[in-house]
């Protein structure tokens, strides 16, 4: 019954949506980027705050094509949305009466490799190899830490790479912070990298976040029976970044919950690891001190805690697989928004506690928007661009629940971690209460794509076309100077124009009024599979 109500709502909502009229806003200087164009050539796609047109028309793709008559002299945006749960590569083509060539065979999968190695995927792959019935760690940690006080030390194991469950380094770390829910150890070699006052401030703020994160996602498992989880800050995390030529900020690894007789690198406790400040690059990639202490550490604390909770819910409690890496990362980025603003930690207890985005999220979203037609943001990989888009979608869905479009905020968040499904099935179950709700997800993705285009416009007051936690056309207060300028728009300068979209992705194609007139006053859109596409004309 719940899914039926939502399907009725989406049908009603889109009828309402298509009647809305939007106005354009001021043009800001555009940033140039490459986007795929006809014949595999590169056209110039641009991110810009310009809003073209004032009408939205849904396009019916019966028989995999639609011809649209256009008013001469008016610019148009054609929004093409791929909503393919199989994550396959689909093609579309724009033709005109002057250039009517059609595809005899749509392009096959020929996607670019993401050159950024997905390091967390290596850990998730190792976790997926843990056999069912592997013995959990015995309750030894409570004995080891029972008599420790601030300033005391103990040894920990830290893995040497993301490809082995067995090789590790032993580090000695000092207890620097204690709380009823967690304890913090700092590598004894790194005690000068954080002052006692900085430690106090960082983890006092983190402690205030915990009740909300536990409320949303549940509490961590407690295999060591000490009612706490452990945070280990160590230069070994920084060194991992040096090893992989990347910035590795932290990790959780599920083997720590299992017996060390099976996995020698296990610490036998709920633990995650984080990097230490290193502005001079002495032990790994150099990190700006302000960004490290105000952005990175607060972000990875809530981020890695979500991974720890998720693993406990899926694997320990529900006896299922660990969450798909792409969704696991997207959820962790969403939970970063719970971290309180730097100047007002009480904000998390108000109704507006997610009014601001986490400090590290705008830069991720920026990479997504800049290459939006090349990014599969749901169900594919967990690269930086994909995570930027996946996070933004979860943020949007979260706000749609706040507005009453989707039901039950707490159920949505709890289902994400406590369900027995993973990946897209888990996402559909969390959103709609039904893991087979493909059409409902497709409808929401279409609305999301329209929102990305219109969000940030001063002309729109309807909250349905905004993402209040992040301005998609404005400066971000993220200590990085990130400027978001809307999604990349491809200018169609020749026809036929062919595009490729993978899984859940979208492309914004702009046609000038002069080109429309020169091309006979109409466009034909053809797609490789009408069941996988949605399309909208904006004029």
Regions picked out by a protein language model, each given a short descriptive name:
Residues 19-54:
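Bacterial Sec-dependent N-terminal signal peptides
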Residues 46-65, 69-71, 421-539:
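Beta/coil-rich, acidic/histidine-enriched accessory regions frequently appended to metallopeptidases
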Residues 53-133:
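Long, charge-dense tracts
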């Amino acid at each position: 019954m719940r899914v039926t109500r939502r399907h009725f709502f989406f049908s009603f909502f889109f009828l309402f949506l298509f009647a809305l009229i939007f106005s354009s806003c001021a043009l800001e200087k555009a940033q140039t980027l490459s986007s795929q164009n006809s014949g595999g050539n590169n056209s110039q796609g641009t991110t810009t705050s310009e809003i073209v047109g004032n009408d939205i028309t849904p396009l019916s793709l019966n028989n995999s094509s639609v011809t649209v008559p256009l008013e001469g002299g008016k610019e148009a945006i054609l929004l093409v949305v791929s909503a393919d749960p199989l994550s396959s590569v689909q093609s579309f083509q724009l033709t005109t009466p002057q250039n009517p060539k059609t595809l005899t065979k749509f392009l096959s999968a020929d996607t670019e490799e993401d050159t950024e190695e997905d390091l967390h995927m290596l850990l998730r792959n190792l976790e997926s190899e843990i056999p069912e019935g592997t013995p959990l760690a015995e309750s030894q940690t409570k004995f080891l830490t029972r008599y420790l006080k601030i300033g005391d030390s103990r040894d920990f194991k830290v893995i040497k790479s993301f490809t082995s469950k067995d090789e590790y380094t032993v580090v000695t770390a000092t207890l620097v912070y204690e709380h009823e829910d967690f304890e913090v150890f700092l590598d004894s070699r790194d005690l000068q990298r954080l002052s006692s006052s900085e430690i106090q401030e960082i983890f006092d703020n983190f402690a205030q976040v915990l009740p909300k994160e536990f409320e949303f996602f549940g509490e961590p498992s407690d295999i060591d029976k000490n009612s706490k989880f452990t945070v280990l800050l160590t230069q070994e995390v920084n060194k991992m970044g040096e090893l992989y030529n990347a910035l590795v900020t932290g990790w959780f690894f599920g083997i720590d919950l299992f017996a060390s007789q099976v996995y020698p690198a296990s610490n036998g406790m709920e633990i995650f690891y984080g990097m230490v400040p290193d502005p001079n690059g002495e032990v790994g990639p150099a990190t700006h001190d302000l960004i490290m202490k105000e952005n990175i550490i607060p972000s990875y604390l809530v981020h890695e805690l979500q991974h720890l909770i998720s693993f406990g819910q899926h694997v320990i409690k529900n006896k299922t697989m660990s969450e798909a890496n792409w969704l696991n990362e997207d959820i962790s980025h969403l939970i970063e928004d719970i971290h309180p603003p730097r100047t007002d930690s009480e904000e998390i207890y108000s109704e507006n506690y997610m009014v601001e985005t986490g400090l590290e999220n705008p830069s991720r979203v920026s990479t997504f928007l800049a290459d939006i037609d090349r990014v599969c943001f749901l169900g594919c990989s967990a690269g930086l661009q994909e995570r930027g888009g996946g996070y933004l979608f979860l943020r949007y869905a979260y706000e749609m629940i706040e507005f009453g479009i989707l039901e039950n905020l707490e159920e949505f968040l709890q289902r994400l971690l406590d369900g027995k499904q993973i990946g897209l099935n888990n996402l559909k179950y969390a959103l709609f209460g039904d893991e087979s709700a493909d059409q409902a997800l497709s409808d929401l993705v279409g609305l999301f794509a329209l929102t990305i285009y219109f969000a940030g416009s001063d002309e729109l007051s309807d909250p349905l076309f905004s993402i209040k936690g992040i301005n998609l056309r404005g400066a971000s207060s993220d200590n990085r100077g990130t400027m978001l300028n809307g999604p990349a728009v491809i200018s169609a300068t020749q026809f036929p124009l062919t595009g490729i979209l993978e899984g859940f992705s979208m492309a914004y194609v702009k046609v000038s009024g002069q080109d429309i007139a020169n091309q006979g006053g109409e466009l034909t859109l053809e797609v490789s599979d009408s069941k996988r596409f949605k399309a909208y004309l904006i004029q």
